Amino acid sequence: MLRVATRWLRIGAAIALVGSFGVAQDTTRWGTMSFNSIVDALERQQSGVRPQASYQVIREYRLSGANDSSANSHVIAEVDFRPPASTNYRIQKSSGSSRGQQVVRRVLDHEVEATSNGEQARTVINRENYDFNYIGEVVLDGRPCYLLGLKPKRKEKDLISGEVWVDKHSFLVRQIDGEVAKTPSWWLRKVRIKLTFADIDGTWLQTGMEAVADVRIIGPHTLTSRILDYRSAEVASSGTRIRSADRKQ
């Protein structure tokens, strides 16, 4: 049963690839735009220039079970990104259930493998992977955004059926929320994913994730992650802390 309870968490790593590679910001402002122009601008940003310099993030992971407090655990991981296609990690600290560290290692192993295999193209928010529909203009954390509906073109666990918040000024993705297009197991009724993004030292990164799985028989389980710290290549190699990534935007 423990294997069943943790299997869904691999999805979180695959979905996280949507934003695991930061993009250099282009904050060009646009006037009133048509729906197609919004999607065009979003796609241009998705395919924008990737960071050339290596960087490191410190992530905090929390695993919890709504009906099972013994599943609760807390893990801190150090993740190194080396463009164009290299990722490695180290677990810094782990407490609570040993299941937490096992799950986080599976998540990060999947991320490392997907990075080296170039699989991130299959999760990009573009017309190759999704059909879009315009919902309206909204404000998210004080930022004006276009809210678009997402309908995956394929039934794959790496794609999300839901909504995307696109920054009205930069056309970068600020948030994605929805259910995975396909669950990898009969044991999983559904998996809901929420991803958040923000600027860290001029690079647009996925800063948080919440994945909630409705597991048959044993009930819901939740995995969350957030960036605690971001370090440039020079700072990471010296071991000096540069800044916290969970500041208010």
Label for each model-derived stretch:
Residues 14, 161-163, 177-179:
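Composition- and surface-driven signal marking solvent-exposed, interaction-prone regions
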Residues 14-24:
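Hydrophobic h-region of N-terminal signal peptides that target proteins for export
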Residues 193, 200-207:
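A short pocket-lining beta-strand/turn micro-motif at the edge of beta-sheets
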Residues 176, 207-209:
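Beta-strand-dense domains in secreted/periplasmic systems and polymorphic toxin scaffolds
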Residues 1-13:
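Bacterial N-terminal signal peptides that target proteins for export
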Residues 25-161, 168-172, 181-191, 203, ...:
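Structured extracytoplasmic
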